[in-house]
UniProtKB/Swiss-Prot annotation:
Composition-biased stretches (Basic and acidic residues): 862-890
Transmembrane segments: 518-538, 567-587, 613-633, 651-671, 684-704, 775-795
Its membrane topology: Multi-pass membrane protein
Cell compartment(s), UniProt: Cell membrane
Pfam families membership: TrbL
GO cellular component: plasma membrane
Signal sequence interval, chain numbering: 1-20
Species of the source: Rickettsia felis (strain ATCC VR-1525 / URRWXCal2) (Rickettsia azadi)
Keywords: Cell membrane, Membrane, Signal, Transmembrane, Transmembrane helix
GO biological processes: protein secretion by the type IV secretion system
Listed name of the protein: Uncharacterized protein RF_0092
Length: 890
């Protein structure tokens, strides 16, 4: 004994220096590497649909846009799009504001942008024919032939600036945002103008008092206004009034006059020749604030000063107010949001009256002169010296928009969306036509390939982005294909044919026809006798009702009876079931398969990751997760059975519907008489109940399914690679009298590695929040999941009661058993259970053995009567009485 003790101690002393961290570190590292290799199994997300969205700008209309999404033939493709992000394009105008002494108000030339033609239009501008033989009659500038100038031209010009010749003002609506920017003259005289109107300056080297001009003769200095007395101007260019200096200045003080030295061009807003105006503009500076006509020295107004802008009579820019200068864009602008609507006016309170001593208004000339020669003499003989100078111009671009404004219905209807599926990812040519889709489009993909979308927009006056949401089913369809295409559709098609054939044979039967004719004859006879006897008080409604009844029964015995009633009456019931089922279901795998909604459900509850995590939980016997997994699996089996009940309920409802339709001739005849009309009403109620029952059943079922999906994700937890069963080696020598008792784990194999559920312990931080999947949360969630599955299992009975209350049609009662209502679906499920009972028992036998021998560790059976061990390893079950056991053997 002493020798044995000594050997044991020697082994222990020799083993002590060999620590796991030192000698077996590579083994420990290898085990940790497995953990990082396998990682964790996350709870899957139920994504049977691949969804996406894309915004397609109207600026890219006609060009195919890639979604980056691939679709599969025969599977659902849904496209929803909206035009809520589309607004009208801002209304754009080019405006030339010019001072001309011949008009009492400033000249305003307006060009409107036409988005359809992508050009500006000078609406209502007076076009003068210059040469009938010209290829472009009406070309601008006007002709230089003075003999062709007439008072008609002057009248048209006056009408144009008074907006009475087709020239419309700029309209502004309440809420519109108005942006006015100063631009160069080249922007206004853009070649991008319809019919080349106002594409270049209206100017002529030959003076014509009746012609229109646009040039302000400021040379390179534009967007400026001169408003100064002749004295201040002459004090700059000819202060001494030197008669030898051809300045055009005469007189002193308030009697100072200025006259253009070459011609009378001051009449048309051109008081100086180009060289003179260049010198003059170089001498003056920008006017100070609150400057006026007598400000000394002479100055010019810029940044929009000197011009008043009104909207609906409300001033939005004062005369002395400057445009805002943007340093980043080097532009001057004014920004305004209209509080009320109206027309936009460009005007000024500086008057041109009294600039000359004689009348210079074109409106007066057209009234006072009837002879062109007299008008020419008037212009040539009078002295056109100016008392003050008021000339210049502003070129502006006006943009008006309103993001709150919606496009008009016509423009909205013209916008369409097309989709295209290609076999490869190559950009399709714009000439390739696609399939138009409505706002809520759902159909099965015609082929495999990549999805492309494009907007077709014939309207160029709107802007924005069309928002498109798309989704396509990516899961499997095997279950619905088997259930619907393999089982249900053949049954429904067969019963449709049966119903039609039976109905036609019934209508053609001579006995039925004689009954119908006799009923009609009797109905008309009784109606006539009662009417003659005065027993009826006929109203228009009653007369129409009786006529309709007679017409319906008379049409019933005709050859085209089936075609008529099936088209206008029976189809409302036979197609009504499919219509309601299809429209109630949100997620489905195929539009052509009314049971496609089952595919996403089976994709969720047959997900391999879900069942893998449940299997991992089954292995957690020591902490109770196995019990939760068993509850979940049993609940899923119960739910699958409920799905089968829904399918059987649909089939039974359709069969009952077709049978009722095949008997329609009998019930339609019964509607003639009040005593038999109740049978006809009950027949209609029965038809309606067969339509309503599967619809309501499906609605309840889908609502429960939404809750079940959320609960299932809470029952299943993620699992990470870890030690499933720890391995500890213990050594207890106390029985040998040696005071040694310890245990240790192998450093290279601390336990059997496998996936272990990641379940946190219950703590004060998570017990109240229920956010962490603790054991308590998992257990309560599993019970809820089980309750919902039981709820779905009892839906058929509940829906039968609801439909009976709605349609007043109750199922027949079984004799005995407290007169319980019959349940065809329950009977079918009971028969299925009887057939599958042997399979169920065979599947449960291994589970029972596992429970007895592994979990309960009942290796040695006890005597049923005494409770003592029989000493028989793996003996018979002791919970089976001998009597039952003997009967079972027999």
């Amino acid at each position: 004994m002493k020798i044995l003790k000594s050997l044991v101690l020697l082994v222990l002393f020799m083993a002590m220096p060999a620590k796991a961290d030192d000698a077996f570190s590579w083994m420990s590292t290898s085990f940790g590497g497995l953990k990082s290799l396998f990682g964790c199994l996350e709870v899957p997300e139920f994504t049977s649909f691949k969804e996406g969205n894309i915004g397609i700008s109207l600026s890219t209309a006609g060009t195919w846009q890639s979604t980056g999404n691939s679709v599969e033939k025969g599977k659902l493709l849904k496209i929803n799009w909206s035009t809520s992000g589309i607004t009208p394009e801002p209304r754009k105008y080019l405006v030339l504001y010019r001072i001309d002494p011949r008009f009492s108000t400033p000249q305003v030339f307006i060009k409107t942008y036409n988005y359809s033609k992508l050009q500006f239009e000078a609406l209502g501008f007076p076009r003068f024919v210059t040469d009938n033989n010209s290829a472009t009659p009406g070309a601008i500038p006007p002709d230089k032939d003075l003999d062709a100038l007439s008072f008609t031209k002057m009248s048209d010009s006056v009408k144009y600036f008074n907006y009475s010749n087709g020239n419309s003002r700029i309209e502004v609506k309440a809420g519109d945002v108005v942006n006015i920017s100063l631009v160069g003259k080249d922007n206004f005289f853009s070649p991008n103008t319809l019919d080349n109107i106002l594409t270049q300056e209206l100017d002529s080297s030959i003076f014509a008092a009746s012609a229109l001009y646009t040039q302000s003769n400021l040379g390179n200095f534009d967007n400026r206004i001169i408003y100064s007395s002749a004295k201040e101007v002459c004090d700059l260019i000819d202060a001494s009034r030197d008669p030898d200096k051809p300045s055009g200045c005469s007189g002193t003080g308030s009697a100072t006059k200025y006259k253009s030295i070459n011609s009378n061009e001051a009449l048309v807003g051109k008081p100086m020749i180009t060289r003179a105006v260049q010198n003059f503009m170089g001498l003056i500076n920008s006017c100070p604030a609150n400057a006026g006509i007598n400000t000394s020295p002479a100055c010019y107004y810029d940044q929009g000063r000197g011009m008043i802008i009104k909207v609906g009579g409300q001033v939005i820019k004062e005369r002395d107010q400057s445009f805002v200068n943007s340093g980043s864009t080097q532009s001057s602008f004014i920004y305004y949001q209209a509080t009320s609507g109206g027309t936009m006016d460009f005007t000024s309170d500086w008057q041109v009256n009294n600039m000359f001593s004689n009348s210079v208004l074109m409106s007066d000339w057209s009234r006072n002169f009837s002879n062109y020669a007299n008008f020419v003499d008037y212009i040539n003989k009078n002295d056109w010296s100016a008392n003050f100078l008021y000339f210049g111009r502003y070129s502006m671009i006006v943009e008006i928009g309103n993001g709150a404004n919606s496009i008009n219905p016509g423009d909205q209807q013209n916008i369409s969306l097309e989709y295209l599926i290609t076999s490869d990812g190559t950009l399709p040519d714009p000439s390739v036509r696609g399939t138009p889709v409505d706002y809520n489009f759902a159909a099965d993909a015609p082929q495999d390939g990549y999805l492309w979308l494009r907007v077709v927009n014939p309207n160029s006056n709107i802007q924005g982005v069309v928002s498109v949401n798309y989704a396509n089913y990516t899961g499997t369809t095997w279950f619905s294909d088997i259930i619907y295409n393999g089982a249900i559709k053949p049954i429904t098609d067969q019963f449709r044919t049966f119903s039609q054939n039976f109905y036609i044979k019934l209508v053609k039967n001579s006995a039925v026809q004689n009954i119908a004719k006799a009923a009609l004859t009797l109905y008309v006879t009784i109606f006539g006798l009662m009417f003659v006897a005065g027993a009826l008080k006929l109203t228009a409604v009653e007369v129409i009702t009786r006529i309709c009844k007679i017409a319906i029964v008379a049409f019933l015995i005709r050859e085209e009876s089936w075609s008529f009633f099936n088209t206008y009456f029976f189809s409302a019931f036979t197609n009504g079931i499919d219509f309601f089922v299809t429209n109630v279901v949100g997620a489905t795998s195929s539009r052509a398969n009314i049971f496609g909604f089952i595919d996403p459900i089976f994709d969720k509850y047959t997900n391999g990751r879900i069942w893998g995590l449940l299997f991992i939980e089954l292995l957690q016997i020591h902490n109770g997760l196995a019990f939760i997994a068993i509850i979940t699996i049993y609940s899923l089996i119960t739910y699958f059975r409920a799905i089968l009940e829904v399918i059987i309920g649909y089939v039974i409802a359709f069969i009952g519907l077709t049978v009722m339709i095949s008997l329609a001739p009998f019930f339609i005849i019964l509607m003639l008489f009040e005593k038999t009309k109740s049978l006809f009403d009950n027949w209609i109620s029965t038809l309606l109940s067969y339509v309503v029952q599967p619809t309501i059943l499906l609605i309840f079922f889908l609502l429960i399914d939404q809750v079940l999906s959320e609960q299932l994700l809470k029952v299943v937890v993620r699992a990470c690679w870890d030690t499933l069963i720890p391995i500890k080696i213990g050594l207890d020598l106390t029985n040998l009298g040696i005071p040694i008792n310890f245990s240790f784990t192998l450093p290279f194999l601390p336990g059997i590695p496998f996936y272990v559920p990641d379940v946190p312990e219950i703590s004060s931080s998570n017990i109240l929040t229920n956010k962490a999947n603790t054991f308590l949360v998992l257990f309560t969630t599993a019970l809820l999941f089980y309750s919902y599955c039981l709820m779905s299992y009892g839906l058929v009975t509940f829906v039968n009661i609801v439909v009976g209350m709605l349609t007043n049609v109750t199922p027949a009662r079984i004799s005995g058993n407290y007169q319980e209502r019959s349940d065809p679906v329950g009977a079918v499920m009971q028969d299925i259970g009887s057939v599958t009972k042997p399979i169920k028992k065979a599947a449960m036998a291994p589970a029972r053995v596992f429970k007895d021998k592994i979990i309960d560790q009942n290796y040695k059976a006890r005597k049923p009567e005494g409770g003592e061990h029989t000493n028989k390893f793996l003996a018979e079950r002791n919970d089976v009485p001998k009597k039952e056991e003997g009967e079972r053997k027999e």
